[in-house]
Amino acid sequence: AVDASKVKVRFELNSIPRNMIPDIEGLTRVLECCVDMSKEESEDTITMVKDAYKNCSRMNFHVLSCTDFGTKGMAGPYDHPHPFYTYMNSKGSSPGDPSRAGSHGHGKDAPLANSAVRTIFASSTYRNDEGEMTHMAQGKCVLMSHYQDDVMHENVGRWGAFNMTPVTDLESH
């Protein structure tokens, strides 16, 4: 933390209209492909995929927002080993002070496991090396490998800028 005496953490449960979820139609199409692909999978997998697909048609989504203030946050730039990149892309990797507590890079999947559509969005506002306020936002879903338009896709999908990096111009999205 920048100043531990001034750190604030806020948790809010919000109801968000379906049309406010970035690329919800794209996620719905991917889940439909996963439903088709899951037919040969275990009952647990079939149930999880069908439930996620069904949940994508909701008119409103419950979204848990976790916000912290007065910390170093998930700063960039968007490359290894910086915190935002590591949180959204790395497995078993946790940059930072070696004395800090935590699950050493494995706990970051917990929000995905608790999402009805196995999807998270993360955003960060931080001061870059030049002292300017910088913003990043990116989405991530972990589903299953699937075919879409006769092309095999991996189990991890991302929402972001054209090349699947974080969106930095928040006004345009």
Where are these regions (language model features)?
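Conserved ATP-binding N-box helix of the HATPase_c
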Residues: 1-19, 27-54, 107-112
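N-terminal assembly/transducer modules of large multi-domain enzymes
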Residues: 1-5, 19, 153-156, 163-173
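Flexible phosphate/Mg2+-sensing switch loops adjacent to catalytic phosphate-binding sites
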Residues: 6-9, 23-25, 99, 120-163
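Short, solvent-exposed beta-strand-terminating loops
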Residues: 20-26, 71, 75
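Short, low-complexity, polar/charged sequence segments that are solvent-exposed and flexible
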Residues: 28-33, 83-87, 141-143
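A Trp-anchored, charged/polar loop motif used as the substrate-binding/catalytic surface
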Residues: 39-51, 158-173
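Flexible ATP-lid and adjacent glycine-rich G1/G2 motifs of the Bergerat
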Residues: 42-131, 136
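Basic, gly/Ser/Thr/Pro-rich low-complexity segments located predominantly at protein N termini
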Residues: 78, 110-112, 144, 162-165
